[in-house]
């Protein structure tokens, strides 16, 4: 009596299929049916069968080696599953046979004017969070555990020194009780990241990674899939932004701002003391770990560069900065980057004791609506790269500092950041500064009658009403600026070790108070009476490095060596520097300009390296353009409208 047919299941890396066989059939009889269900370039002699997935330690046998073996002899029953492994024919896969190129059927059908068109490789589109390059600091903080360790609680712990209970187990970095106890108002960025990632990517689900962060987007999406005309001709619920509900941001991208030396602040204040006008400068430094806050980040300021500007009693106006890229390049050679901006808002109290008027306090404002809009524009120009965001970037580490009077009449520093929502609202042109510094205005679509490209969504915020209840309010026409502001801490190191140890070189763009950068200042700093250590100390000045860069006397390698001498101050590097052709060119320029050049033996003009010729007019150096502050004296505001003018109109989004 013939046996009833059985169904066997087969699985390969191409998928699964079933075959109906007789128990008395032999294994090699399945080869034609198996080849029909595998790719065409499979080598038939490489087909392998196994009782487990290929490569996991099962009993793997070549199909050709099972000649004479039937299914009933190995105990296979109805519904059993076998795993198939195979190798592809490399010669056919690469399109070669016996050393000749053989076009495939697909290539043969692809022709242009009778000539075959080779098929191009398919470009793999990767997710932004897979290819983005984070900073080394973020990579280091991502690897940290971040939990807050606690000691034994003598009141509640009942176990030994090696035990652990609920009263002494480590806390998460976002634990609300710990933050309230330490009076930490905002979570650090990486603590906030741990908090939201714990609910987005749960380890027990074994699901694929999804970035927990997403940047807010308050503009009309141009890539709407609904098929209607683009805005402003058409709009739907898929492309229009949702209503905005403002609330104070619970985290901050940077927790602390540290100035490496008090001289940085004093040099900026000197301009106000001499002119009575305000001043603005960009902060250059690094980002480091801030251990006072769980997984915290601090911005360490090493230098302040003052760009071209027009300074007035009530504010400043930024002008075009022609050498912006050059200054950033010098900072990069010194291991620095632009990390923030600082400006003064000072008014003398008139008592003759150096006290100033306190304009920023709890009953007025801390950062005006105009300054928040300026900070938001600056942060939009310096986004933060992170693999935890769907777009590959989120927020910004750019900080904004203000020098103003406190309630005691002393000059103090305050550090802030605009919230992530504030940056997007400014980018989407939803808000605009108000004449009242403590409120921000919401734009109206009626104001844009000529250009209908702007869409203003509904904006709401919550406040405590007259009955003591938190109620939702419509933000139009204005709302408090506190909803767009994040406060940071600031301070100075206990043991100061600034990167640049000299600050005697004149600061740039100060011709309005009679200070300019000239070659005579370079000559004076380099005349060190034969002491190399003093010369190394002299070039350790960021403003001098930027001035030397403008002379174009050093090539890239020599300038990198100069910046290394300025930051590391190694005597060996200093001696190597003075024997470079660029240094010889600098000495020649000083001689031709009539300035006093260095005359000591340690600063000779090296004979093997003839000085390079550079385009330079002796005794004359080009000054900033007519738009710079060197041609304008600080003036007092003549009307109320000038006092309320947009003082930072020079800054704009790219």
From Swiss-Prot:
Any Pfam family the entry gives: NPL4
Annotated Gene Ontology cellular component terms: endoplasmic reticulum membrane; nuclear membrane; perinuclear region of cytoplasm
Ranges of biased composition (kind: Basic and acidic residues): 632-645
Position of the signal peptide: none
Comp. bias regions, Low complexity: 620-631
Alphabetic keyword roster: Cytoplasm, Endoplasmic reticulum, Membrane, mRNA transport, Nucleus, Protein transport, Translocation, Transport
Protein name: Nuclear protein localization protein 4
Organism annotation: Aspergillus niger (strain ATCC MYA-4892 / CBS 513.88 / FGSC A1513)
Species classification: Eukaryota, Fungi, Dikarya, Ascomycota, Pezizomycotina
